[in-house]
């Protein structure tokens, strides 16, 4: 959430930010509310000043033995007006906060201007695309044929956009998860957390999913609880309403969790395979950074996500999201896209974002500077390290062989009991 006073004093800056993002949010709506708030505030302050000055007059009349009943009656009316105006003022301020809760974060000045994903610049590549002497197959054919993935039974159990993993498929999913967690905790210093997979509304407000994106969430019937769309939600909210020590920053967490998304805006997209599921696993990274070092931490976190792909020998590219393609809470985002030869395209496998103080303000997460009595909001960052299902897809498609088998990347073999090649049973 943006700072209320900043918005009140910089409406033109906010309007420009919304235009860069392609947002249709009407700044004039807030401007009208704020004009009304200022008018009410002036009226209330004027009436309170009148009441205060008149109280001295009443006391004087009483000391002199005079009749102050008319003035007292008039002041009763004034008090009633003040009470009514205070209620109106509360309603206006609530409306301002509601409007503010729907305003996306302001893009950092280093973010390139653009309208769609087509405007996202590629900033680097790693590795080379694998070469095949045959036409590579999509994972949804090959993995099913090898018996590790079952979409039909998943559809019977639940419906579309679900999968059953079994045999080598279940083991590969588990191996990838353990490998990712080990790299992030042992090599990059993250603290592993297993959080609840169900959270309350306050948590989702803190990270920005509510109130604007409720349709993307799975809500529990008769409960004000939701299934997590990403572990970013519980990890960030671990420190909601807390004041952290400056010496503790940066704090880094990672969590392997299932994620649950309705994919409300994805009708007709990626209807085959594992790319877009209602339930999927992801290893999430979250950092709480000092404001002076958060963009340095963003580069570091992005490198931590890239390291997984490097160790797996998977070709990828990194792009910077333009202003029109950024997530709601982000000030700057890098997407990592892995090459999928079966689909002959790059697909997002990680998104690493610096939200600066946007989430911290919503969730009231501060730190105490050593050289100041005034507490400051921390900066929060989040990123996938990585999306497990999409990494599963990348391994299957990049390491497939002409005979229909799949070679296990060397880094994963210790997690697969030494298995080197997946073949049909």
UniProtKB/Swiss-Prot annotation:
**GO CC annotations on file:** cytoplasm
Listed binding positions for L-serine are 230-232, 284, 384
What is an example of a Pfam family matching this protein? Seryl_tRNA_N
What does the subunit comment say?
Homodimer. The tRNA molecule binds across the dimer.
InterPro entries in UniProt:
aa-tRNA-synt_IIb (IPR002314), aa-tRNA-synth_II (IPR006195), aa-tRNA-synth_II/BPL/LPL (IPR045864), Ser-tRNA-ligase_type_1 (IPR002317), Ser-tRNA-synth_1_N (IPR015866), SerRS_1_N_sf (IPR042103), SerRS_core (IPR033729), tRNA-bd_arm (IPR010978)
Please cite one Gene Ontology biological process associated with this protein.
selenocysteine biosynthetic process
Annotated binding of ATP, by residue: 261-263, 348-351
Q: Which organism is it from?
A: Maridesulfovibrio salexigens (strain ATCC 14822 / DSM 2638 / NCIMB 8403 / VKM B-1763) (Desulfovibrio salexigens)
Query: Where does the UniProt annotation locate this protein?
Result: Cytoplasm
Can you say what this protein is called?
Serine--tRNA ligase
Catalytic activity from the UniProt record: tRNA(Ser) + L-serine + ATP = L-seryl-tRNA(Ser) + AMP + diphosphate + H(+); tRNA(Sec) + L-serine + ATP = L-seryl-tRNA(Sec) + AMP + diphosphate + H(+)
Q: Does the keyword ATP-binding apply?
A: yes
Please give the chief subcellular localization of this protein: cytoplasm
